[in-house]
């Protein structure tokens, strides 16, 4: 029997209620009680918490369930890897956590100031220039306009392309712009669906240092096939398989299981 068999498979815990704290003082952080199979969320707690997330897609051949009852929590400064083979639902989960897509059912509690998925360029207005997109996002987040433009310009290294409509950008240029704009805002939790891989090795190192060194105090939800990055920076892992998920606090054990999938 392989490790998956010994761990009892990946079916998630039982249906979990959303419960608010009535006790005085600061509420405890949300945790999954493995004995009772319930996740309790205190809505004002400083954490990110998922309760029984389900995601269905309607196809020509019927309903396809991509995620089935996913529950987990991330505390301030904590870094969790999301592992699974291609098609396991990793990117879908990140989009749900970030609010890019709604779940079919379940609850996402966002008690930390959280980024959109890093390098996700789907939120740009294609007909606007790069600079106008930066200014627009800066206004939404209450950031100083000129300072934000300068930070993004310096990091993204797009030069005069920032004056052109985003629809003229390559996918790599859009990713650079989105990555740099994400770093210009003081998020407490970063959603990372694969570390940016455009540009040369110097730019890769620049992205790595900006995210994992300068922002090592931040919480992160990291999807990556680079096990070295996961070993270096993550505290625990969520493994997805066939729509189900399970969180492992022992990262080395989680990586051993992942490599048997």
Predicted feature locations:
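A short, flexible loop at the N-terminus of ABC-type nucleotide-binding domains that lies
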Residues: 33, 37-50, 54-73, 79-81
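ABC-family P-loop ATPase nucleotide-binding domains
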Residues: 60, 113, 118-201, 209
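ABC ATPase nucleotide-binding domain signature region
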Residues: 79-81, 85-139
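Helical segment within the ABC ATPase nucleotide-binding domain
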Residues: 204-216
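Conserved H-loop
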Residues: 217-223, 226-232
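Conserved catalytic segment of ABC-fold P-loop ATPases
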Residues: 232-239
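Conserved beta-strand-loop-alpha-helix hinge in the C-terminal portion
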Residues: 244-261
């Amino acid at each position: 029997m392989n490790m998956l068999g010994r761990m009892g498979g990946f079916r998630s815990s039982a249906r979990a209620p959303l419960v608010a704290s009535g006790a005085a003082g600061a509420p405890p952080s949300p945790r999954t009680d493995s004995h009772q199979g319930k996740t309790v969320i205190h809505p004002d707690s400083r954490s990110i918490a998922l309760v029984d997330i389900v995601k269905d897609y309607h196809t020509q051949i019927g309903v396809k369930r991509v995620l089935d009852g996913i529950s987990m929590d991330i505390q301030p400064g904590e870094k969790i890897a999301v592992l699974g083979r291609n098609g396991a639902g990793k990117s879908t989960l990140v989009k749900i956590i970030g609010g890019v897509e709604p779940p079919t059912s379940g609850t996402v509690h966002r008690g930390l100031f959280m980024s959109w998925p890093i390098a996700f360029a789907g939120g740009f207005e294609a007909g606007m220039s790069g600079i106008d997109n930066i200014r627009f996002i800066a206004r939404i987040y209450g950031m100083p306009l000129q300072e934000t433009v300068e930070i993004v310009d310096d990091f993204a290294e797009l030069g005069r392309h920032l004056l052109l409509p985003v629809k003229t950008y390559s996918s790599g240029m859009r990713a650079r712009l989105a990555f740099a704009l994400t770093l210009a805002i003081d998020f407490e939790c970063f959603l990372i669906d694969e570390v940016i891989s455009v540009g040369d090795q110097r730019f890769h190192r620049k992205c790595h240092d900006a995210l994992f060194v300068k922002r090592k105090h931040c919480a992160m939800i990291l999807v990556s096939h680079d096990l070295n990055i996961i070993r270096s920076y993550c505290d625990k892992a969520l493994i997805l398989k066939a729509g189900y998920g399970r969180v492992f606090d022992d990262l080395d054990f989680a990586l051993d299981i992942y490599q048997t999938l």
